Amino acid sequence: MNLANLQLFAHKKGGGSTSNGRDSQAKRLGAKAADGQTVSGGSILYRQRGTHIYPGVNVGRGGDDTLFAKVEGVVRFERKGRDKKQVSVYPVAK
C-alpha cells in the first residue's frame, strides 16, 4: 500500500510591497476672481506659490503670497513691464 505524502501550498504568491501609492492633496491654486469682476475688500484674488503675479493698486500680498483686495472695486489683470503681470483693484464711483 502506497501512502502518498500530500502537502498543499498556497496557489498565489504573497502580495509584496511597493513604495508608490501616495499623492498629496491638490492645493487649489490660481485665480479666484476674474478680470472685470467686482469684489469686496478682503476678497482673495489669486492664490499662488511665489510671485507669479504681483500686487498692484489696492492689492495686498499675504504671507503665503496670496493676493487680496484692500478695497471694494473692479479687478484688473495687467502687464507690469515686458514679462511680469500684476493685479489691481480700482474703486467704482457710486
Swiss-Prot record:
PTM comment text: The N-terminus is cleaved by ribosomal processing cysteine protease Prp.
Top-rank lineage group of the source organism: Bacteria
Propeptide cleavage-removed residue intervals: 1-9
GO terms (BP aspect): translation
GO cellular component entries: cytosolic large ribosomal subunit
Molecular function terms, GO-annotated: structural constituent of ribosome
InterPro entries: Ribosomal_bL27 (IPR001684), Ribosomal_bL27_CS (IPR018261)
Pfam families referenced in this protein's UniProt entry, alphabetically: Ribosomal_L27 (PF01016)
Keyword vocabulary terms for this entry: Ribonucleoprotein, Ribosomal protein
Region described as Disordered: 11-34
Similarity comment: Belongs to the bacterial ribosomal protein bL27 family.
NCBIfam families in the cross-refs: L27
Listed name of the protein: Large ribosomal subunit protein bL27
Organism: Streptococcus pyogenes serotype M3 (strain ATCC BAA-595 / MGAS315)
Upper lineage: Bacteria, Bacillati, Bacillota, Bacilli, Lactobacillales
